[in-house]
């Protein structure tokens, strides 16, 4: 199933869910918001983005934040592809390939050069003799066709693509074009009284026009004896989301006019607060960050610092209120490609569907790529009947919604 059909599948699910609601919830979701804002708060500025990172005009629209507060948001459609740095390389070609000609891998414990030496050492590194990503001639098993990429970049990796290094290409996305994404960013951030692990599908956008994604599903990737290679900038492709970031290494368009002892800004979080590059270990000893990696300074107001890429989590949570899909006016909600099919008058609620099912947005998108509700349910570790019950619809309706899109 290509990206357009995947979006239509999710849209169909959102339509089916409309009668029973799709609100997001979390045990630590904020109960109230802090109405006051720091006088020096850095707010959204279109001028900070690199030329070409934003597609079309930024539109100011009324929006409702997830805590119920009505405000104004900037509706921003990003290019879905970095405009100031080159994507790749990802996988090494052979077991003698050097780090210069390959990307990186991070798994929550460290960042590793994907050179030939790392590939040959995987069995020892992960203490699993099943690992062998290369053939008798020393060539690395790489997903070098679109079919291989789509068969491997999913939770239920096809058997012939296990023990592969997984990489994608722009040409293999729908129409060979980047996947644009529209996000509603509060023009005046509203700090919540408590941190929230909930988020509107992705954590934010970079000043280069790239989605800041949630953590990569490392356990599933390693469980299939695959390496979903990142480039040196911490990004990679998947068929559903296109190019997106899971780690921050300092690439791209940066705003470096911060005060002394501060790192450069590289993006905005979904709640409107700026995101800066990671702090060094030495700098971390001199500051106190909250549970979401944020703090306030006299020059910048409240802002986040990204984790080191090794954490496989650019941000652990959000400290501010954000726009839930379906609560925004203007262009498509977060998670829907600009110009894509509308799910309903409230927009496509990708995170709402995922929240109802108790899975991540990544997991839901990857499961729906299969085009079959029974297969998708198996991937998600449940049954089609259980999914239907949670969504308040029938299994037949679920399958019809997906089947209709695969025949278009």
Predicted feature residues:
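Extracellular/lumenal glycan-associated surfaces
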Residues: 179-188, 206-211, 239-252, 297-312, ...
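Short helix-loop boundary/capping segments
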Residues: 221-231, 239-282
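Long, compositionally biased interface segments
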Residues: 38-52, 287-343
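Mature extracytoplasmic/periplasmic regions of secreted or cell-envelope proteins
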Residues: 32-36, 305, 329-408
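C-terminal motif of bacterial Sec signal peptides marking the signal peptidase cleavage site
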Residues: 16-19
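Bacterial N-terminal signal peptides that target proteins for export
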Residues: 1-9
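Short, low-complexity, disordered segments immediately C-terminal to signal peptides
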Residues: 21-41
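Solvent-exposed N-terminal domain segments of exported/luminal and surface proteins
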Residues: 34-221
